[in-house]
Amino acid sequence: MRTISPASIRQHFARAVMPLVVFLLLLAGGVYATNYSLWINGRSSTAQPGNHADFTYWGPASTAAGVNKKSVNWDGFSRVSDQNYRVRDALDCYCTGTNWCYIAAHSAGNLQIGYALSLYGGTARSKKNATPNASGVCGNSDGGTQTGWNIKWVNVAAGAGGGSELANVGSWAVKDPLTSDLKTATARALYDHNQTRAKWFYMYAGSKGTLYSGVLPGQDDEAVAYHSAGGVSGSGGAGFCNPSDWFCNDLTMGTAANEGGKAKWSYHSVKFRDDGEALNHYTNSAWGGVVSKVRADMAANAN
């Protein structure tokens, strides 16, 4: 019978327990990864700025919408540049250090995440502890910094990154500062839409328009046209439609150039096009409209 020496026993034991020891040390030091799902609202009169637990804008907080979901509440009223710090605070909180984020944005929330990534995604960010105070600001974790944020991808429902013709012609009977940013020429010049820091923007475009939205070119969801919701590049809007419309160039799926040759912005891909003309722009505080498609994707894949 083979005799196993005490030294050999100690060696095998050390190999067996070492992974457990390392794991426990990392756990004790708080060095473990957590994924979060951040939801960035658009125009709103109900958002509670800095309150990452309030989902009034979206719908019931109990609804599945991605792992560890947080509501990135900015005021939904001010200029993008004036409220973007709220978005950056949330990104710092949950998307630094060992933590990673999935992002979902709606309407003008598209401008907010695009603005943050383009202008601040290459800057030094302090690593945070994912424990926000009442203002939505987290404390530092280990005193270290990193460049930009840990983001897996960005889902955009009814994106207003390209602006809306309704803002151009004053169809919205409001005078809030945000409307100025939503004019098509302004929205498209607000930041470099091609600079996403290599993060993919997956676009979800609804097309249940109405007669009063006739000012919007091509297919629309009552508030934004396909040129915006589909991430079509350029300094101004143009008409893009579903394949069933013979009198308008198609908004193509994926990253391919649209019919007529117009390209999408870099790292922008159309994931959903509302060929059935069934989904409008609005959540109705019930995860409704085209947001329903993004919510379903986040519930299934943001984990």
What is each residue range found by the language model?
Residues 195-303:
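C-terminal catalytic-base region of ester-bond hydrolases, centering on the histidine
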Residues 17-28:
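Bacterial N-terminal signal peptides
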Residues 35-37, 85-200:
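Serine-dependent carboxylesterase/thioesterase catalytic core
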Residues 43-45, 110, 160-162, 208-211:
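Short, solvent-exposed loop/turn segments at secondary-structure junctions
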